[in-house]
């Protein structure tokens, strides 16, 4: 018998209600504390800071004995005892590629531990531990001297890896929070789990974006102060401090309301088994995906377009700084514009495409990909024309709006399309594969853009690659048949259910 079916006294029930409410607010606070890191620091601040450190320690492209000056348009950074020279923009891109690679490995490994030790208390401790390390790594950038670019890259990788872990663990808390909330609300009304999950998840995302928006506004104010003029490290310090400060109440807010079935106590002696479980889970997910043709088509297409969309942001920020010479404050404003329009795109674009234009799901995805492809295509026009094609700073503000709408719309539509293709009862397995595809793809783009920039010393050439990548995803998604995928998913779900019934019959 499940513990959840045991009747409780009024006193115990009131205690459960109070604990459940704390868990809900704790989950919102997790998003509130951590979202500014990925939206502000990783998307804008760290690329600028890495390029700045690289330029300050760089040398001229043609003469490696002469230090890089303020008037030099392109410079290279000596690495590994001056054995290797990389473009100052490439340094940031290579750091991101390495960070995402290590983050993916760490996330897969940690997910095995979380799947075995399912208690809210354990997940809370993981959130606090990695959040504290990530926050400290972020804040530590303010202590660096101008020549410590290796340490800056290391701190960037550490903080990004920590965010990846708390993002996965935080998302795994959502089903627990919903389950507990449904348990205490069932006395008052019938609750639909999917609807409750959607509501809480949506509110959490909204709260996270509000936090990121507040941090961005505070950063603009700080960077405009005479004593902090364009010192991006102050903005990074704000993000790290925010992350650590607002996660502290989780110590008192997140805890178990009921005993979780099949949960085990964490033991250091079983660490190898925990790590192995994460990779086995990934293998099982890949095996399931291999049985569904349209899931494979979607994941291949998503690998391509997700990589392109993510890399467009990094390339555009670095391009704006190195080619258009935009100030840090202006680049933060561009980031704010992107974020606001991403929210608008996520809310209104799916409704416009499906209800007003009556487009089928996969065609909506293709329309959004074409919309996003305008950005790198417009960047390539700069090779042909003198007055358009990202030749002026004001063009970046227009493209920030365009990019935000495409990013928000793609995120919303892609998840809804993918949800139609997966079998019942396997949602967690397939969405973990979706998440890993999303994260893993972000290694390729920055790495290739870094190589292109090293070869040409002109980051504008990266727009050719990004445009080709966006275009390459269109025939892949055009081969997607959502109706066929739904039938395959239903058939696989039916097979799994019949196996369970057969096993029950022999029990």
Curated annotation (Swiss-Prot):
One Pfam family cited in the UniProt record for this chain: ATG22
Topology in the lipid bilayer: Multi-pass membrane protein
Keywords noted in UniProt: Amino-acid transport, Autophagy, Glycoprotein, Membrane, Transmembrane, Transmembrane helix, Transport, Vacuole
Major location (coarse): membrane
Glycosylation sites: 262, 496
Sequence similarity: Belongs to the ATG22 family.
Name the record gives this protein: Autophagy-related protein 22
Biological source species: Eremothecium gossypii (strain ATCC 10895 / CBS 109.51 / FGSC 9923 / NRRL Y-1056)
């Amino acid at each position: 018998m499940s513990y959840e079916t045991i009747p409780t006294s009024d006193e115990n029930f009131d205690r459960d209600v109070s604990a459940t409410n704390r868990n809900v607010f704790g989950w919102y606070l997790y998003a509130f504390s951590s979202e500014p890191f990925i939206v502000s620091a990783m998307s804008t601040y760290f690329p600028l800071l890495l390029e700045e450190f690289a330029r300050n320690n760089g040398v001229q492209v043609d003469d490696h004995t002469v230090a890089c000056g303020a008037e030099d348009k392109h410079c290279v950074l000596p690495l590994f005892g001056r054995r290797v020279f990389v473009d100052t923009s490439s340094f940031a891109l290579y750091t991101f590629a390495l960070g995402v690679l290590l983050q993916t490995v760490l996330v897969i490994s940690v997910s095995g531990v979380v799947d075995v030790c399912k208690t809210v208390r354990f997940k809370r401790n993981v959130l606090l531990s990695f959040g504290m390390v990530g926050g400290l790594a972020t804040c530590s950038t303010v202590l660096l001297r101008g020549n410590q670019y290796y340490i800056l890259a290391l701190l960037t990788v550490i903080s990004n890896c920590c965010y990846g872990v708390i993002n996965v663990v935080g998302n795994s808390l959502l089903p627990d929070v919903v389950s507990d909330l449904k348990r205490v609300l069932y006395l008052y009304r019938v609750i639909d789990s999917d609807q409750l999950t959607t509501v809480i998840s949506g509110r959490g995302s909204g709260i996270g974006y509000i936090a990121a928006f507040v941090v961005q506004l505070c950063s603009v104010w700080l960077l405009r102060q005479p004593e902090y003029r364009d010192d991006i490290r102050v903005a990074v310090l704000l993000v790290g401090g925010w992350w650590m400060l607002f996660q502290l109440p989780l110590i008192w807010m997140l805890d178990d309301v009921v005993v979780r079935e099949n949960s085990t106590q964490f033991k250091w002696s079983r660490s190898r088994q925990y790590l192995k479980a994460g990779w086995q889970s990934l293998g099982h997910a890949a095996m399931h995906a291999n049985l569904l043709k349209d899931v494979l088509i979607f994941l291949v297409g998503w690998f391509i377009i997700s990589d392109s969309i993510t890399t467009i942001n990094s390339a555009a920020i670095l391009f704006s700084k190195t080619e258009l010479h935009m100030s840090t404050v202006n680049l933060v404003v561009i980031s704010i514009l992107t974020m606001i329009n991403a929210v608008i795109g996520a809310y209104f674009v799916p409704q416009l495409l499906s209800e007003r234009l009556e487009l089928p799901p996969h065609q909506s995805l293709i329309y959004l990909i074409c919309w996003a492809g305008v950005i790198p295509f417009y960047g390539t026009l700069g090779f042909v024309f003198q007055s358009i094609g990202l030749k002026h700073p004001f063009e970046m503000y227009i493209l920030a709006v365009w990019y935000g709408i495409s990013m928000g719309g793609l995120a919303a539509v892609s998840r809804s399309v993918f949800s139609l293709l997966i079998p019942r009862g396997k949602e967690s397995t397939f969405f973990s594969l979706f998440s890993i595809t999303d994260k893993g793809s972000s290694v390729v783009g920055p790495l290739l853009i870094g190589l292109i920039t090293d070869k040409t010393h002109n980051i504008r050439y990266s727009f050719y690659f990004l445009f080709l990548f966006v275009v390459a995803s269109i025939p892949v998604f055009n081969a997607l048949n959502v109706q066929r995928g739904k039938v395959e998913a239903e058939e696989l779900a039916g097979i799994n259910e019949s196996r369970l019934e057969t096993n029950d019959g022999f029990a």
